[in-house]
Amino acid sequence: MTTRLYTHPIFLEHITPPGHPERPDRLRAIERVLDDEAFAALDRVKAPEGDEATILYAHPADFVARVRAAIPDEGIARIDADTTASPKSWQAVITAIGAANAAVDDVFTGRADNVFVAARPPGHHAEKTTAMGFCFFNTAAIAARYAQRKHGAERVAVVDWDVHHGNGTQDIFWDDPSVLYCSTHQMPLYPGTGAKNETGAGNIVNAPLAPQTGSEVFRDAFLSRVLPALDNFAPDLIIISAGFDAHHRDPLAEINLTEDDFDWATGQLMQRASRHSGNRLVSLLEGGYDLQGLAFSVAAHVGRLMKG
């Protein structure tokens, strides 16, 4: 089982204000834990800069232009109440998209069985025409559409276990039955979407979790909602929106998962990738704001990807 890792120094240069939870130290914590000899077999690749035209797979041109115009020449500019930009943010965003699309290329051409993209800023809150929740563009949605356009994937599944609902991914694929979107998330919690009755064209599966939910309820949601949907859909590619803020240490939510839960969930999705997708699985970093919880969870996730 070949596992590839994409990252890039530019991801550290997307600067947020002091005290902001989505900060460069998140990537530093991940880099430190993956430097351990246990991960020596990782195929480490510097993320390529993305093709800006692929942003249009998920977002209209006028919105893309507005976001680009909001990037400051110096200092920090506010995109919305939670989302800020610094001078290198555009390059970071474009490189994150480039890494995700390259990961899709890798799993379709056989260069890797699965790929983890350690990039920031995250993407799953970005709607078609709205940047929000620390997110500029929806990297997972762009990668899904890229797989369809570049590699002829007929069905792509996006599984999102970030503690916050991926309202952006749901918005983009709401009426697109060629993409399955499955989400486990705390509810009530930002952004307030993700109720069970939000089903789109029958391609949206939301499994909201009550505050203080632990391993048993999370795993039951996977077993009863997410995995049956994947088996019924039989995707050609599985993309994980891999947020690790459902970890019990995370300050932004109240779900009590451990790194073992992310190991288990990764294994379950790898089984489905083996069954339906020729092992093709791409994992994209989303949230996770306690540095220790994030590092331990990523280590468990990537370790499972490598074990097969």
Predicted features along the sequence, with ranges:
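HDAC/HDAC-like amidohydrolase catalytic core signature
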Residues: 1-308
